Amino acid sequence: MAEIKREFRAEDGLDAGGDKIINVALADRTVGTDGVNVDYLIQENTVQQYDPTRGYLKDFVIIYDNRFWAAINDIPKPAGAFNSGRWRALRTDANWITVSSGSYQLKSGEAISVNTAAGNDITFTLPSSPIDGDTIVLQDIGGKPGVNQVLIVAPVQSIVNFRGEQVRSVLMTHPKSQLVLIFSNRLWQMYVADYSREAIVVTPANTYQAQSNDFIVRRFTSAAPINVKLPRFANHGDIINFVDLDKLNPLYHTIVTTYDETTSVQEVGTHSIEGRTSIDGFLMFDDNEKLWRLFDGDSKARLRIITTNSNIRPNEEVMVFGANNGTTQTIELKLPTNISVGDTVKISMNYMRKGQTVKIKAADEDKIASSVQLLQFPKRSEYPPEAEWVTVQELVFNDETNYVPVLELAYIEDSDGKYWVVQQNVPTVERVDSLNDSTRARLGVIALATQAQANVDLENSPQKELAITPETLANRTATETRRGIARIATTAQVNQNTTFSFADDIIITPKKLNERTATETRRGVAEIATQQETNAGTDDTTIITPKKLQARQGSESLSGIVTFVSTAGATPASSRELNGTNVYNKNTDNLVVSPKALDQYKATPTQQGAVILAVESEVIAGQSQQGWANAVVTPETLHKKTSTDGRIGLIEIATQSEVNTGTDYTRAVTPKTLNDRRATESLSGIAEIATQVEFDAGVDDTRISTPLKIKTRFNSTDRTSVVALSGLVESGTLWDHYTLNILEANETQRGTLRVATQVEAAAGTLDNVLITPKKLLGTKSTEAQEGVIKVATQSETVTGTSANTAVSPKNLKWIAQSEPTWAATTAIRGFVKTSSGSITFVGNDTVGSTQDLELYEKNSYAVSPYELNRVLANYLPLKAKAADTNLLDGLDSSQFIRRDIAQTVNGSLTLTQQTNLSAPLVSSSTGEFGGSLAANRTFTIRNTGAPTSIVFEKGPASGANPAQSMSIRVWGNQFGGGSDTTRSTVFEVGDDTSHHFYSQRNKDGNIAFNINGTVMPININASGLMNVNGTATFGRSVTANGEFISKSANAFRAINGDYGFFIRNDASNTYFLLTAAGDQTGGFNGLRPLLINNQSGQITIGEGLIIAKGVTINSGGLTVNSRIRSQGTKTSDLYTRAPTSDTVGFWSIDINDSATYNQFPGYFKMVEKTNEVTGLPYLERGEEVKSPGTLTQFGNTLDSLYQDWITYPTTPEARTTRWTRTWQKTKNSWSSFVQVFDGGNPPQPSDIGALPSDNATMGNLTIRDFLRIGNVRIVPDPVNKTVKFEWVE
């Protein structure tokens, strides 16, 4: 039986209930009648991945490196490593079909080249019965879809355009664009890919036929308008851009006309417009009205003429224009409301006509923060800060009474309301008008009269509308030949001496003339004195006549004409009662004494007379010298006779300051000065004792206090107080003994606590002490004590010796999963891993283990039940028996089967060689085969009415034996008479638990195939539905021509490495999600890489985005709420590198290597210098220093590209410097770097053509008004043709 083959064949097929089944083994390709199994079918009739172990026929197609290859010749088995020389690559590109005119029925999968240049209209009709995933591509190759119609019609399913609208037809309007139609969800989804959008330069030379999506650049090569004709066909929303390259459009204009009368431009019914602005703009097609709507990017405010009532728009400039002077008219201008704060309006009223009134009116809830009066040359006292601002509802201007202004108003809002404030007010300035009294009353400007005009007298017809300034008025002085002004002479100028050089251009008033009296040195007016005035002798301003002089006789009461007393025989009186003679005769009153007579008049004890002054020695001694008995003491000598310790004399009373000083020994103190010497902090003296009330008041600084009053003050408990809630308690007084105590703090009482000791802090029992951070940190947690504890480091955790540190989850995970020293060994308990593969077992099912036992791991691994059973499968069960086939056990020949007779064998018959039968093999019982069973033709299992099956027993639980028996059953229920008779014939494969799969032909003739579990095929071709109730596992790729539909929220999971990826649709959003590391089949982690809103289609990138190539945003713009970082590529030729399509755009590069940044400009060291005039320091630019920096590029095209280079000096005193340069497209090179100045890096004088502030040299300098040097101002003096020097504080 050992020779029995594992494969068996049948000439006509196996008997399987009347139906043929395929061979078990692979078919022979040379035998035409040989059946095939699934393996052969997949091997020979599908496109598979290249297999180096098999052979291939000529033209057999395989997949290698994601490409299709066909064998050039037969390749024998094994084919070996892939050799491209033995294979021919197959084409996978689309077969493009060119359509130039007429109608065309599109088919799914077609790629159409649309030739619009042929000049014909083309209509494409979409398929009527597409399936999901069908694709059609249309590519314009003619470039004229806007002129020649390209219409795509959907007869059944609608087309979804770029706005999400479902339509039945669309136009291809963009030149060289590609239109992709994908059938999905019962709709044709349309995508338009435009050709690279480039500028189209249009000149006046020819009329340009525009197309949708054109970017037209106007360039005026001649002084003529540019003509542009709009396309014949356009889709709703199509745009054509216009740019004025050389800004000449305002001079030569652009004329835009529609293709025909079916469309309009700017306004319905308008077929031609002329543009005269220079700013960019675009035309957008409105299909609803067949109208090209215009957006003009020109933001310049242009004047709007207003002749009737009008509503003013924000940021608008208007002008009120009157019809004529005979029409009385009131125009109301309504200001807008609820607009943006800061919006302005400008209203010009300088073209109002006579009789015209303009009312500028705010909305009902708004106010105008001014009035007409404040806008018409107000007085200083009529507006703040002298007065309050006013608000009005409207401003009314009349052309006849007001000075019509140009008024600019700005809109603001605050907590008080909404206002229009006057940003600028320019009233019309009139010239003065002397026509009549009414015109003379109006304010106006006036020219200044020249000096010659100002000097004209009234009879010479002077000018009426010129103003005389104080200067010209002051210069119109009176002369002998003209009237004018003259200065009144001052008293000083009039009352000069006779010899003075008097002025001839000033006048003397009667008062000044009357004041010029005659004196000894000047001529003047004077009165004649009366006799009384003469006798009085006190008036020095009147004159005396001879008569008056003669009448003035001298007397005791009047000086006058007198006679001298005689000097001969003069004798003094002998006693005081008597008279002497001559000069001694005191009764004579009409004589005058001459000096000689006076010298005779000496005083004696009995006679009055002249005395001689005593000398100092006589005064001090108290005795006259001999012969000078008439000596007398003068105040001077008397003053020298001062009182000392040794003599009597005069003594001076001390002043109060001298008394207060207390150092003078020669002066006397009076009671008053003694009383006024009051004691102060710096002066000893007398003082009054304060009363108790005065002492308690504490404001008197001039009195003294006694000890009793001080004690009385400080011995009172009223002097102190505390806040009981703060835990303060007081006792005693400030005089006797004052005690201030702080209560101990508790849960209800504020107070003070002492600092706990380390022992007390560790004990944790006291509730009336406080713990400092040091004590808290010193209270360490141990096995016997609670306290603070430090988290152990990873190395401390691995060491495992610390008893006072805590293990974090992170370090616990480390020692449990990664630390080898914590693994379990034969000596210690510890962490283990589960073993797998060669770590558990190395061997086979013949000899068992083939590896030395000592080479297996002894430590850190545990064997799982799976691994245990896998290894035990290679060994006999414990109670199994093995037979020794080499022994006969002493049997004789009679006990053996003979070949020549029929025998019945009672025992078991075992054949070790092939058994050949020429007759049928019939068994009334069962048959068992230890090897394969083969039949050359048919293997029939007869059905005698009982169910038939093929059973594969499980065998012993060892080696590769199955755990359950398997059976193949063929049955049906069509004849069973039950309620279900639909299962006509069933081929079922199962085990002891349930069926694995079955194939059944139903009563209606259809075949169904059911798998109760996971399908792991190489390839499956299913022409109908395939229902899998469990899990289907595919060992290779799965390709579907239709959709993969999953009704689970989580679908399409991909697993590789530590992570799983799947797509989740939670009804509101669709997510791209990842699992946690090591949980590839689990739920999602916290990352949200991609989110799609199911309603809007909006995509949210939650975890960052790296774009390796470019990205294009066609509409909607880009909003970034965080930073954008665009890093360029630094190359060695970065300084001179010309931009390319890959490098145009915004990027930034940090340059830190000297080889690169030395090519770029640096920063300038600033050198401190001193101003030679002011002595103050100032900074001046010094040498250039190269430094690292950042190069940033801006611009979207080569026409708008520029770079900024900003240096970042490495020293703190240096300043950052910014440079910039532009790409010169016409020169194909960068311009030179130029420096950008700012507040931190101002330009030097030489940078702007100015002079430095110190040591400047120039050829000449003209100053119009004045020159100032420090506090000195040098002002020109045109009258004297020189300069004046003025000191300015």
Curated annotation (Swiss-Prot):
Location(s) in or outside the cell: Virion
Keywords on record: Late protein, Viral tail fiber protein, Viral tail protein, Virion
Pfam families assigned to the protein according to its UniProt record, in alphabetical order: Gp34_2nd, Gp34_trimer
InterPro entries noted in UniProt: Gp34_dom, Gp34_trimer
GO cellular component: virus tail, fiber
Family: Belongs to the tevenvirinae long-tail fiber proximal subunit protein family.
Record function comment: Structural component of the proximal-half of the long-tail fiber. The long-tail fibers of T4 are about 1600 Angstroms long with a kink in the middle that divides the fiber into proximal and distal halves.
Subunit structure: The long-tail fibers are trimeric, with a stoichiometry of gp34/gp37/gp36/gp35 of 3:3:3:1.
Protein name as catalogued: Long-tail fiber proximal subunit
Native organism: Enterobacteria phage T4
